[in-house]
């Protein structure tokens, strides 16, 4: 093998190895902050897992140089439990946290924003959509036409409630709707508590409709109109530290992306979004 080929191979191996050390050391999610700063992190896309957001929040919480956090939210929401987990972590971060809404911060995206001390949105931001949704598909007639029969063994009458293989009974609907409404009231209770609004007003607002940022402010659902930069400036004023650095935390990447610095968009989000379940999700068409 020619000498120059060996050199190229050696360099490639070294780069990959060095990159792996950086990844494994966790120096890409806010650990490289070297001076007192306001950290700006992003939560975007549909929410089906809380681990990435919470990992970043945890690092910012434990970094003594981070004096405050701006959470930029650009999400229509997603699964109920991950949305709740992120909300809880933001609420209990122990540092000043402001939420800054992007194009969309609705349903679960609005919920996680409620954990912040103050909420900012652009006048044109789409937010609100306070509610829960569950989409179910019934394929019984199709299965009958093609001669496919479903055999189900179950321990109770409602174990297969919502199954696509049989028609849903009224009692099935009631059982599932009871669960859905309990999740809904958990959401509205948080809105009442965090926004200081009367229950009657929240229940009027929480019918699933979306609002612009301007409408949301008029209804008391957010605090301020403005971008994340305004939020950062206001936090500096609140802390009385006008010279604080503003550090934008890099968005988390997959292990392969971290090692190779390549990224690719997949259809995974679309595949996941077809899952059956209860969602704090704004279905904006």
Give residue spans per PLM region.
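N-terminal organellar transit peptides
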Residues: 1-99, 104-105, 118-121, 134-285
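Short gly/pro/ser/thr-enriched loop/turn and capping motifs at secondary-structure boundaries
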Residues: 104-108, 126-130
């Amino acid at each position: 093998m020619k000498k120059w080929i060996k050199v190229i191979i050696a360099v490639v191996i070294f780069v990959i190895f060095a990159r792996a050390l950086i990844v494994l050391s966790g120096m890409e999610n806010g650990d490289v902050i070297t001076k007192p700063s306001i950290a700006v992190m992003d939560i975007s896309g549909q929410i089906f897992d809380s681990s990435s957001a919470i990992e970043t929040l945890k690092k910012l919480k434990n970094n003594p140089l981070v004096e405050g956090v701006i959470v930029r939210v650009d999400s229509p929401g997603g699964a109920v439990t991950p949305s709740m987990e992120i909300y809880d972590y933001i609420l209990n971060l122990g540092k000043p946290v402001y939420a800054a809404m992007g194009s969309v911060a609705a349903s679960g995206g609005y919920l996680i924003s409620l954990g912040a001390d103050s909420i900012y949105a652009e006048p044109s931001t789409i937010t609100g959509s306070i509610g829960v949704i569950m989409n179910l598909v019934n394929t019984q007639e199709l299965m009958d036409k093609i001669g496919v029969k479903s055999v189900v063994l179950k321990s109770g009458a409602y174990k297969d409630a919502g199954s696509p293989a049989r028609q849903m009974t009224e009692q099935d609907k009631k059982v599932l709707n009871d669960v859905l409404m309990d999740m809904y009231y958990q959401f509205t209770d948080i809105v009442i508590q965090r926004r200081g609004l009367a229950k009657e007003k929240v229940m009027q607002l929480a019918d699933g409709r979306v609002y612009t940022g301007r409408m949301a402010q008029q209804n008391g659902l957010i605090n301020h109109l403005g971008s994340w930069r305004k939020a950062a400036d206001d936090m500096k004023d609140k802390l009385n530290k006008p010279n604080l650095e503003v550090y934008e935390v890099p968005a988390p990447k997959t292990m392969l992306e971290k090692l190779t610095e390549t990224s690719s968009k997949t259809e995974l989000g679309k595949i996941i979004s077809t899952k059956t379940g209860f969602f704090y999700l704004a279905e904006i068409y």
